[in-house]
């Protein structure tokens, strides 16, 4: 038997059936740890294809613990792992967009490589993570926002996590979070940390099915729209994938350096997010407005980035986003 055990040799491109069987076997406990590790590393070395990414995501979708989301619900989620250690932009964007009357089923986890992931920052703000995940269905219906904790929503991943940790490098599972939202949303703003992979990832999302999503990556390898330079953007609809470029100027915002939105630990990031929602101006606000504008386009709430910036800014300046966060924390 080869070192890959029940898996096909990943030096050759896998077709859909091969990839689907491989990831089903992996998630269902049909291979040894060392075989899984060898397969994942070889796949990463060769470079994952659209077919393989979609098959892995579908295998995770088939095994998650779901909730029902209202029509038009969106997710704003990044793959993480970009190494820039910025403030929690997608978390703040989720709150701001929900305050614009767009239901948001936020899928996230604790930090893997940064100091503070979405779950860490929200906990530091006072959100009871266990209760939030348990009451996600009710919170989404009552508040228009919920947090779906990846650590509990994907029980099949519990065996894979220590293997990923032992590998100690990026694998296909670093791309999976946004593609396996337990609310099964069909509108997403997805950030990835690999600009060159935007078209591949977008084709995988198209294969899985979406009403309107955008896959974004800053030229610096940022897993969100960057104010520092250009951005790769893939617009994904049932008709296919359309590539475009975007910069802060398109949203009427100034260029900002990544150093201006450098984050810290959960407490640091939570304080920054609270100040943002209380009306503090600066680079963090601009980054949130830029990404929120893109999310509002995905939701069908606005047609242009400048309109989206105006709507998001209004939700902050009128205190709607801060009030929503307070209600979310206090929800019983």
Curated annotation (Swiss-Prot):
Q: Where does 5-phospho-alpha-D-ribose 1-diphosphate bind?
A: 78, 81-82, 86, 88-91, 106-114, 118
Classification via InterPro entries:
Anthranilate_Pribosyl_Tfrase, Glycosyl_Trfase_fam3, Glycosyl_Trfase_fam3_N_dom, Glycosyl_Trfase_fam3_N_dom_sf, Nuc_phospho_transferase
Q: What EC class is this?
A: transferase
The family line of this record is: Belongs to the anthranilate phosphoribosyltransferase family.
Q: What is this protein called?
A: Anthranilate phosphoribosyltransferase
- Name any cofactors this protein relies on: Mg(2+)
Q: Where does Mg(2+) 1 bind?
A: 90, 224
The UniProt function text for this chain reads: Catalyzes the transfer of the phosphoribosyl group of 5-phosphorylribose-1-pyrophosphate (PRPP) to anthranilate to yield N-(5'-phosphoribosyl)-anthranilate (PRA).
Q: Which of this chain's residues are annotated to bind anthranilate 1?
A: 78, 109
Task: Report residues binding Mg(2+) 2.
Answer: 223-224
- The protein's assembly and partners: Homodimer.
Organism listed in the record: Sphingopyxis alaskensis (strain DSM 13593 / LMG 18877 / RB2256)
For this protein, the Enzyme Commission number is 2.4.2.18
**Which biological process, per GO, is one annotated for this protein?**
L-tryptophan biosynthetic process
One Gene Ontology MF term: magnesium ion binding
- Enzymatic reactions: N-(5-phospho-beta-D-ribosyl)anthranilate + diphosphate = 5-phospho-alpha-D-ribose 1-diphosphate + anthranilate
**Name of the gene:** trpD
